[in-house]
Regions:
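Hydrophobic packing segments in regular secondary structure
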Residues: 2-65, 193-282
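A generic structural signal for residues embedded in beta-strands
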Residues: 346-347
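Alpha-helical coiled-coil
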Residues: 1-7, 73-172
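Long, contiguous alpha-helical "rod/stalk" segments
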Residues: 47-121, 180, 186-187, 191-194, ...
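Extracytoplasmic/secreted envelope proteins and their assembly/folding machinery
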Residues: 99, 113, 117, 146-149, ...
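Aromatic- and glycine-rich peptidoglycan recognition patches
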Residues: 2-4, 11, 22-29, 40, ...
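Catalytic cysteine-centered active-site loop
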Residues: 286-341
Length: 398
């Protein structure tokens, strides 16, 4: 998807997936920052002052680009964790289900064995047992239950069904135990993957926070220097700088991406959309926490899932990618240019239906979206960003 300006695309490719072994930090050459004396000297000459202003503004936009790239990495790694946790939860549910089946099957097999023991005891008392019955009652000689059962040539015809059922139940219980063992091994592997993904996501969040702390510190200096060069107040200069930063962020894409319709999708259910909106807006200002889905902490797919759940609509698991697949399976994808309030939108680093979607938002209309983006931000309403925006939106209701 060629929606990023060349400079930002280069930054994101290097910063997002660490191609060629380079980190985001290594992607940006460390440029020397102007000293207070250099700024003071520049004030004495109009040309030098103009050049110094441009230099400082360039430094600020470069720092912003670094932060944007790190935010993207943090969102990608957060989605990797959510996917891994989804898989872990699915296997954990499988283990729990199998454990219940094993417990029930073991109890049934035990009960069947007791029934056979009662029959054998009765036969012994009635003198109907021979050597094979002795084997049945003597585990040390027989070796195992199935061998014991196979040796019972004198079990009465009326007991034959109980005998066969006991064997089947024993075999069924053993089969379930084998499945449970495999599932537990799979769960251990999935848990390890999820833990690694969580650690990677936390490291990305820490790196992002460190960059923001550095940028705040440097920006205080740059704002003061620019204010002195332009002979305005620091507060006014800060407003100018914030406008520059906002423009830099918003200019990472050109606008809605053209895409063909895949199939007919009906209009949304406005009542359900409004319920989802009302729920989501009640969370504005609440913190982002990786894996959060309420009651007062959220991540991107957590708030979309909970908001539509409040309206009785299932949009997928706690994963941006899974929510995209859910919309695709239900044939509810529409070209991004045809999106209406209530539709879900995704961000992806590949222009591929099967690629991961690292961020999901709720479209509010009029070019605005509601999101829980990353550890530095809270749940918020902001202008739609077009950089990395996937070309299809999803309509949870119709």
């Amino acid at each position: 998807m060629k929606t990023l300006r060349s400079r930002f695309l280069a930054l994101f490719v290097i910063g997002g997936l660490v191609f060629g072994g380079l980190s985001v930090e290594a992607a940006f050459a460390k440029k020397p920052y102007p000293t207070a004396q250099e700024v003071e000297n520049a004030r004495k000459n109009a040309a030098r002052k103009k050049a110094m202003i441009k230099r400082l503004q360039t430094i600020i936009t470069d720092l912003t680009a670094e932060q944007v790239a790190l935010e993207r990495v943090a969102m990608i790694k957060a989605e990797k964790y959510n996917q891994a946790k989804d898989e872990e939860d699915a296997v954990a549910a499988k283990v729990e289900l199998l454990q219940g089946k094993v417990n029930a099957a073991t109890a049934e097999a035990k009960q069947a064995k007791q029934q056979l023991a009662e029959i054998a005891s009765q036969m012994w008392r009635n003198g109907a047992a021979g050597t094979s019955m002795s084997l049945f009652l003597n585990a040390q000689k027989a070796g195992n239950l199935l061998y014991q059962l196979g040796a019972q040539e004198k079990i009465a015809q009326s007991s034959d069904q109980i005998y066969k059922s006991a064997i089947q139940r024993q075999q069924y219980a053993k089969s379930l135990e084998d499945q449970l063992k495999e599932a537990k091994e799979e769960l251990a592997a999935k848990t390890a993957i999820a833990e690694d993904a969580l650690a990677a996501a936390r490291n990305a969040a820490d790196e992002l926070q460190a960059k923001v702390d550095e940028q705040k510190r440097l920006n205080r200096t740059f704002v003061a220097q620019l204010a002195r060069l332009e002979n305005i107040s620091n507060s006014l200069e800060q407003q100018r700088i914030q406008g520059l930063i906002d423009e830099q962020r918003q200019n990472t894409g050109t606008g809605p991406i053209d895409a063909p319709s895949l199939y007919e999708v009906g209009p949304p259910d406005t009542n359900k959309v409004n319920i989802a909106f009302n729920f989501a807006k009640q969370q504005l200002g609440e913190r982002y926490v990786l894996g959060g889905m309420g009651p007062n902490v959220w991540d991107c797919s957590g708030i979309t899932k909970a908001s539509y759940a409040a309206a009785g609509v299932y949009i997928g698991t706690h994963s941006a990618t899974n929510q995209f697949y859910n919309m695709a399976e239900k044939r509810r994808l529409i070209p991004i240019k045809d999106a209406v309030p209530g539709d879900l939108m995704w961000y992806s680093y590949v222009d591929d239906f099967n690629g991961d979607k690292y961020h999901v938002v709720m479209y509010l209309g009029n070019g605005m979206m509601l999101e829980a983006p990353n550890p530095l931000r809270v749940v918020r309403i902001v202008p739609l960003r077009y950089g990395d925006l996937f070309r299809y939106a999803g309509r949870p209701t119709d």
